[in-house]
Protein backbone atom coordinates (compact mmCIF):
# COMPACT_ATOMS: atom_id res chain seq x y z
CA UNK A 1 0.00 0.00 0.00
CA UNK A 2 1.48 3.34 -1.12
CA UNK A 3 2.45 6.01 1.39
CA UNK A 4 -0.62 8.20 0.96
CA UNK A 5 -2.94 5.20 1.33
CA UNK A 6 -0.98 3.89 4.29
CA UNK A 7 -1.32 7.26 6.02
CA UNK A 8 -5.06 7.37 5.33
CA UNK A 9 -5.57 3.86 6.65
CA UNK A 10 -3.58 4.63 9.80
CA UNK A 11 -5.69 7.74 10.42
CA UNK A 12 -8.98 5.86 10.04
CA UNK A 13 -7.80 3.01 12.27
CA UNK A 14 -6.72 5.50 14.93
CA UNK A 15 -10.18 7.11 14.85
CA UNK A 16 -11.74 3.64 15.03
CA UNK A 17 -10.21 2.98 18.47
CA UNK A 18 -12.98 4.94 20.19
CA UNK A 19 -15.56 2.56 18.69
CA UNK A 20 -13.83 -0.73 19.47
CA UNK A 21 -14.64 -1.06 23.21
CA UNK A 22 -18.33 -1.39 22.30
CA UNK A 23 -17.89 -3.04 18.90
CA UNK A 24 -20.45 -5.62 17.79
CA UNK A 25 -20.39 -8.45 15.28
CA UNK A 26 -23.31 -6.78 13.51
CA UNK A 27 -21.21 -3.65 12.92
CA UNK A 28 -18.47 -5.80 11.38
CA UNK A 29 -21.01 -7.51 9.12
CA UNK A 30 -22.35 -4.14 8.00
CA UNK A 31 -18.87 -2.93 7.12
CA UNK A 32 -18.18 -6.10 5.15
CA UNK A 33 -21.48 -5.52 3.32
CA UNK A 34 -20.31 -2.03 2.35
CA UNK A 35 -17.08 -3.59 1.09
CA UNK A 36 -19.19 -5.82 -1.17
CA UNK A 37 -20.89 -2.71 -2.57
CA UNK A 38 -17.54 -1.03 -3.23
CA UNK A 39 -16.07 -4.15 -4.81
CA UNK A 40 -19.09 -4.61 -7.07
CA UNK A 41 -18.48 -1.47 -9.14
CA UNK A 42 -15.23 -0.35 -10.74
CA UNK A 43 -16.86 2.98 -11.55
CA UNK A 44 -17.73 3.54 -7.91
CA UNK A 45 -14.19 2.73 -6.81
CA UNK A 46 -12.78 5.19 -9.33
CA UNK A 47 -15.18 7.88 -8.13
CA UNK A 48 -14.28 7.27 -4.48
CA UNK A 49 -10.56 7.48 -5.18
CA UNK A 50 -10.63 10.36 -7.67
CA UNK A 51 -8.07 12.88 -6.33
CA UNK A 52 -9.93 15.77 -8.00
CA UNK A 53 -13.09 15.20 -5.93
CA UNK A 54 -13.64 16.72 -2.51
CA UNK A 55 -13.67 14.29 0.40
CA UNK A 56 -17.16 15.36 1.45
CA UNK A 57 -18.47 14.66 -2.06
CA UNK A 58 -17.00 11.16 -2.04
CA UNK A 59 -18.47 10.50 1.40
CA UNK A 60 -21.88 11.73 0.23
CA UNK A 61 -21.73 9.40 -2.77
CA UNK A 62 -20.99 6.33 -0.67
CA UNK A 63 -23.53 7.32 1.98
CA UNK A 64 -26.24 7.60 -0.66
CA UNK A 65 -25.67 3.95 -1.56
CA UNK A 66 -25.65 2.51 1.95
CA UNK A 67 -27.95 4.80 3.96
CA UNK A 68 -30.82 2.83 5.42
CA UNK A 69 -29.02 -0.45 4.77
CA UNK A 70 -26.46 -0.12 7.57
CA UNK A 71 -26.41 1.56 10.97
CA UNK A 72 -25.52 5.21 11.45
CA UNK A 73 -22.31 4.07 13.12
CA UNK A 74 -21.26 2.01 10.11
CA UNK A 75 -22.15 4.88 7.80
CA UNK A 76 -20.00 7.25 9.85
CA UNK A 77 -17.03 4.89 9.64
CA UNK A 78 -17.26 4.46 5.86
CA UNK A 79 -17.73 8.22 5.48
CA UNK A 80 -14.37 8.69 7.19
CA UNK A 81 -12.78 6.23 4.78
CA UNK A 82 -14.31 7.86 1.72
CA UNK A 83 -13.11 11.32 2.74
CA UNK A 84 -9.47 10.23 2.79
CA UNK A 85 -7.08 10.12 -0.17
CA UNK A 86 -6.15 6.76 -1.71
CA UNK A 87 -3.42 5.97 -4.20
CA UNK A 88 -5.50 3.29 -5.91
CA UNK A 89 -9.03 1.93 -5.99
CA UNK A 90 -7.75 -1.34 -4.54
CA UNK A 91 -6.28 0.43 -1.52
CA UNK A 92 -9.67 1.78 -0.47
CA UNK A 93 -11.19 -1.70 -0.50
CA UNK A 94 -8.24 -3.18 1.35
CA UNK A 95 -8.53 -0.50 4.03
CA UNK A 96 -12.27 -1.09 4.43
CA UNK A 97 -11.61 -4.82 4.74
CA UNK A 98 -9.02 -4.14 7.46
CA UNK A 99 -11.42 -1.85 9.32
CA UNK A 100 -14.23 -4.43 9.22
CA UNK A 101 -11.89 -7.20 10.37
CA UNK A 102 -10.53 -5.00 13.16
CA UNK A 103 -14.05 -4.37 14.44
CA UNK A 104 -14.71 -8.13 14.44
CA UNK A 105 -11.44 -8.82 16.24
CA UNK A 106 -12.32 -6.22 18.87
CA UNK A 107 -15.51 -8.16 19.58
CA UNK A 108 -13.39 -11.21 20.43
CA UNK A 109 -11.13 -9.02 22.54
CA UNK A 110 -14.08 -7.68 24.51
CA UNK A 111 -15.71 -11.06 25.08
CA UNK A 112 -13.07 -12.48 27.44
CA UNK A 113 -10.70 -11.06 30.06
CA UNK A 114 -7.20 -10.12 29.03
CA UNK A 115 -6.12 -11.65 25.75
CA UNK A 116 -8.13 -14.87 26.13
CA UNK A 117 -10.69 -13.96 23.48
CA UNK A 118 -7.96 -13.08 21.01
CA UNK A 119 -6.07 -16.30 21.75
CA UNK A 120 -9.24 -18.31 21.08
CA UNK A 121 -9.81 -16.43 17.83
CA UNK A 122 -6.23 -16.95 16.64
CA UNK A 123 -6.44 -20.65 17.45
CA UNK A 124 -9.71 -21.06 15.53
CA UNK A 125 -8.23 -19.32 12.48
CA UNK A 126 -5.08 -21.44 12.73
CA UNK A 127 -7.09 -24.68 12.94
CA UNK A 128 -9.07 -23.69 9.84
CA UNK A 129 -5.93 -23.01 7.81
CA UNK A 130 -4.24 -26.21 8.99
CA UNK A 131 -7.32 -28.23 8.05
CA UNK A 132 -7.52 -26.63 4.62
CA UNK A 133 -3.80 -27.10 3.99
CA UNK A 134 -4.10 -30.82 4.72
CA UNK A 135 -7.01 -31.48 2.35
CA UNK A 136 -6.73 -30.74 -1.38
CA UNK A 137 -10.39 -31.61 -1.92
CA UNK A 138 -11.41 -28.91 0.54
CA UNK A 139 -9.08 -26.44 -1.15
CA UNK A 140 -10.73 -27.11 -4.51
CA UNK A 141 -14.21 -26.84 -3.03
CA UNK A 142 -13.46 -23.47 -1.42
CA UNK A 143 -12.00 -22.08 -4.65
CA UNK A 144 -14.69 -23.50 -6.97
CA UNK A 145 -16.08 -20.47 -8.86
CA UNK A 146 -19.43 -22.17 -9.51
CA UNK A 147 -20.10 -22.90 -5.83
CA UNK A 148 -22.28 -20.43 -3.95
CA UNK A 149 -20.95 -18.30 -1.11
CA UNK A 150 -23.43 -19.98 1.22
CA UNK A 151 -22.16 -23.45 0.32
CA UNK A 152 -18.56 -22.40 0.91
CA UNK A 153 -19.45 -20.83 4.25
CA UNK A 154 -21.29 -23.98 5.32
CA UNK A 155 -18.27 -26.13 4.45
CA UNK A 156 -15.89 -23.75 6.21
CA UNK A 157 -18.02 -23.78 9.36
CA UNK A 158 -17.92 -27.57 9.45
CA UNK A 159 -14.12 -27.53 9.36
CA UNK A 160 -13.83 -25.76 12.73
CA UNK A 161 -16.56 -27.08 15.03
CA UNK A 162 -16.82 -25.01 18.18
CA UNK A 163 -15.29 -21.93 16.57
CA UNK A 164 -16.18 -18.59 18.09
CA UNK A 165 -18.76 -16.29 16.52
CA UNK A 166 -16.01 -13.94 15.37
CA UNK A 167 -13.93 -16.76 13.87
CA UNK A 168 -16.96 -17.96 11.89
CA UNK A 169 -17.60 -14.40 10.71
CA UNK A 170 -14.02 -13.87 9.51
CA UNK A 171 -13.66 -17.33 7.98
CA UNK A 172 -17.04 -16.93 6.29
CA UNK A 173 -15.95 -13.60 4.84
CA UNK A 174 -12.68 -15.10 3.59
CA UNK A 175 -14.33 -17.98 1.74
CA UNK A 176 -17.28 -15.96 0.40
CA UNK A 177 -15.33 -12.88 -0.72
CA UNK A 178 -11.58 -13.58 -0.86
CA UNK A 179 -11.13 -10.60 -3.23
CA UNK A 180 -8.67 -12.36 -5.50
CA UNK A 181 -6.71 -14.09 -2.76
CA UNK A 182 -6.83 -17.67 -1.60
CA UNK A 183 -9.29 -17.94 1.32
CA UNK A 184 -6.56 -19.38 3.54
CA UNK A 185 -4.31 -16.43 2.73
CA UNK A 186 -7.01 -13.96 3.77
CA UNK A 187 -7.65 -15.92 6.97
CA UNK A 188 -3.91 -15.69 7.64
CA UNK A 189 -4.10 -11.91 7.23
CA UNK A 190 -6.99 -11.76 9.70
CA UNK A 191 -4.94 -13.85 12.15
CA UNK A 192 -2.05 -11.41 11.78
CA UNK A 193 -4.38 -8.53 12.68
CA UNK A 194 -5.57 -10.47 15.74
CA UNK A 195 -1.98 -11.18 16.78
CA UNK A 196 -1.12 -7.49 16.50
CA UNK A 197 -4.16 -6.65 18.61
CA UNK A 198 -3.09 -9.21 21.19
CA UNK A 199 0.28 -7.47 21.56
CA UNK A 200 -1.60 -4.60 23.21
CA UNK A 201 -2.05 -6.96 26.17
CA UNK A 202 1.62 -7.92 26.47
CA UNK A 203 4.27 -5.72 28.05
CA UNK A 204 7.80 -6.75 27.14
CA UNK A 205 10.08 -5.27 29.78
CA UNK A 206 13.87 -5.24 29.61
CA UNK A 207 15.86 -4.28 32.71
CA UNK A 208 19.56 -3.89 33.44
CA UNK A 209 19.50 -6.30 36.39
CA UNK A 210 17.09 -8.88 37.78
CA UNK A 211 14.12 -7.63 39.81
CA UNK A 212 12.90 -9.19 43.02
CA UNK A 213 9.28 -10.30 43.43
CA UNK A 214 8.25 -7.07 45.12
CA UNK A 215 9.76 -4.97 42.33
CA UNK A 216 8.08 -7.12 39.69
CA UNK A 217 4.71 -6.71 41.42
CA UNK A 218 5.12 -2.93 41.62
CA UNK A 219 6.16 -2.78 37.98
CA UNK A 220 3.14 -4.83 36.88
CA UNK A 221 0.77 -2.71 38.95
CA UNK A 222 2.25 0.48 37.55
CA UNK A 223 1.96 -0.71 33.95
CA UNK A 224 -1.61 -1.92 34.46
CA UNK A 225 -2.52 1.47 35.90
CA UNK A 226 -0.75 3.31 33.09
CA UNK A 227 -2.42 1.37 30.27
CA UNK A 228 -5.76 0.80 31.98
CA UNK A 229 -5.81 -2.97 31.49
CA UNK A 230 -4.33 -6.13 33.02
CA UNK A 231 -1.21 -6.76 31.00
CA UNK A 232 0.84 -9.92 30.76
CA UNK A 233 4.31 -8.72 31.75
CA UNK A 234 7.34 -10.52 30.31
CA UNK A 235 10.60 -9.43 31.95
CA UNK A 236 14.09 -10.06 30.57
CA UNK A 237 17.51 -8.91 31.75
CA UNK A 238 20.02 -7.13 29.50
CA UNK A 239 23.13 -5.99 31.43
CA UNK A 240 24.12 -3.69 28.55
CA UNK A 241 21.28 -1.36 29.55
CA UNK A 242 23.37 -0.56 32.66
CA UNK A 243 20.26 0.61 34.52
CA UNK A 244 16.71 1.79 34.04
CA UNK A 245 14.06 -0.01 32.04
CA UNK A 246 12.76 -0.41 28.50
CA UNK A 247 9.07 -1.24 27.97
CA UNK A 248 7.27 -2.27 24.79
CA UNK A 249 3.48 -2.56 24.66
CA UNK A 250 2.23 -3.15 21.14
CA UNK A 251 3.88 -0.55 18.90
CA UNK A 252 4.70 1.77 21.79
CA UNK A 253 8.22 1.77 23.25
CA UNK A 254 9.30 3.62 26.38
CA UNK A 255 13.07 3.56 26.86
CA UNK A 256 14.26 4.91 30.21
CA UNK A 257 17.51 2.95 30.26
CA UNK A 258 20.82 4.56 31.16
CA UNK A 259 22.35 3.53 27.86
CA UNK A 260 19.53 5.29 25.98
CA UNK A 261 19.93 8.45 28.04
CA UNK A 262 23.68 8.42 27.39
CA UNK A 263 22.99 8.00 23.68
CA UNK A 264 20.64 10.99 23.74
CA UNK A 265 23.28 13.03 25.57
CA UNK A 266 25.92 12.13 22.98
CA UNK A 267 23.58 13.16 20.16
CA UNK A 268 22.88 16.48 21.86
CA UNK A 269 26.59 17.14 22.33
CA UNK A 270 27.31 16.18 18.73
CA UNK A 271 24.58 18.57 17.55
Curated annotation (Swiss-Prot):
Q: Name one GO cellular component term.
A: plasma membrane
What keywords does the record list, in alphabetical order? Answer: ATP synthesis, Cell membrane, CF(1), Hydrogen ion transport, Ion transport, Membrane, Transport
Q: What is its main location?
A: membrane
Q: How does it sit in the membrane?
A: Peripheral membrane protein
Q: Which GO terms describe its molecular function?
A: proton-transporting ATP synthase activity, rotational mechanism
Pfam families documented for this protein: OSCP
Which Cys residues form disulphide pairs? none
Give its localization. Answer: Cell membrane
Instruction: Tell me how this protein assembles.
Output: F-type ATPases have 2 components, F(1) - the catalytic core - and F(0) - the membrane proton channel. F(1) has five subunits: alpha(3), beta(3), gamma(1), delta(1), epsilon(1). F(0) has three main subunits: a(1), b(2) and c(10-14). The alpha and beta chains form an alternating ring which encloses part of the gamma chain. F(1) is attached to F(0) by a central stalk formed by the gamma and epsilon chains, while a peripheral stalk is formed by the delta and b chains.
Membership in a protein family: Belongs to the ATPase delta chain family.
Under HAMAP family, the record lists: ATP_synth_delta_bact
Biological function: F(1)F(0) ATP synthase produces ATP from ADP in the presence of a proton or sodium gradient. F-type ATPases consist of two structural domains, F(1) containing the extramembraneous catalytic core and F(0) containing the membrane proton channel, linked together by a central stalk and a peripheral stalk. During catalysis, ATP synthesis in the catalytic domain of F(1) is coupled via a rotary mechanism of the central stalk subunits to proton translocation.
List the protein's name.
ATP synthase subunit delta
Amino acid sequence: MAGISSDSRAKVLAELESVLPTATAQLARELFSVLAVVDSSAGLRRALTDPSREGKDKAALLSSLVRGKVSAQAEQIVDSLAKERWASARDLGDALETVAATVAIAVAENEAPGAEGLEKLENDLFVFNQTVAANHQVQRALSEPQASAEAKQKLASALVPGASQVAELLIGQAVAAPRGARPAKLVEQFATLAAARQQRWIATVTVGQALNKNQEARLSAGLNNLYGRDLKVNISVDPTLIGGVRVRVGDEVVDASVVNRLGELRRQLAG
